[in-house]
Design a protein with these regions (language model features):
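Asparagine-centered strand-capping/turn motif at beta-strand->loop junctions
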Residues: 60-64
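Terminal connector regions
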Residues: 111-164
Length: 178
């Protein structure tokens, strides 16, 4: 008889433990959930050097199903560690879900930049390797850093226009919050 009592008590405690475990899982699934999406992809859409003005369009792609709110950008393009173009400023930009926007930058290039792009346009070199790095400040995820390597090429039939091809990209990384 004692054996039967112990078995029933053991079964009762096992059922109680199982019920408590199910209650914990149920409570955990009801709490707030943090959903992190994919960071945006940033690249050079096009570049031109016309009338001593360097124009660059940076394409920012939102690869998520929800809008992304950008508050600031810091983008720099370098060739052989010499600054080619860039932008660092506050920017209020909402990018709709699964879409892209472009940020247009115009500046007066230095003589070195003009000479580099002229050598590319005149086919003295086939391409110019570039390094694109920087960060975007988003409302949702804070500061996201990015880096990529690629090459600039002249656009056939369009003097003064250049296109880019990315050869190596690192996904944006969240900076550690202080």
């Amino acid at each position: 008889m004692q054996f039967m009592i112990r078995t029933q008590a053991g079964a009762t405690s096992s059922l109680a433990r199982l019920a408590m475990l199910l209650a914990v899982f149920a409570c955990a699934s009801c709490g707030p959930q943090v959903i992190e999406g994919r960071p945006p992809f940033i690249g050079i859409s096009d570049m031109s050097l016309l009338d001593d003005t360097l124009s660059v369009n940076f394409r920012i792609s939102n690869q998520n199903g929800v809008p992304m709110n950008i508050e600031a950008i810091d983008i720099e393009v370098t060739i052989d560690s010499a600054r080619l173009a860039g932008e660092n400023r506050p920017l209020k930009l909402t990018i709709d879900a699964n879409s892209a926007e472009e940020v247009h930058v115009e500046q007066l290039p230095e003589a070195f930049t003009r000479d580099l792009l002229a050598s590319l346009e005149n086919r003295e070199v086939n391409s110019l390797p570039f390094f694109l790095k920087g960060s975007v400040q988003t409302l949702e995820d804070g500061r996201l850093r990015f880096e990529q390597k690629g090459h600039l090429y002249p656009v056939p039939g369009k003097p003064g226009f250049f296109r880019s091809a990315v050869t190596q990209a690192e996904e944006l990384r969240r900076e550690e919050r202080l």
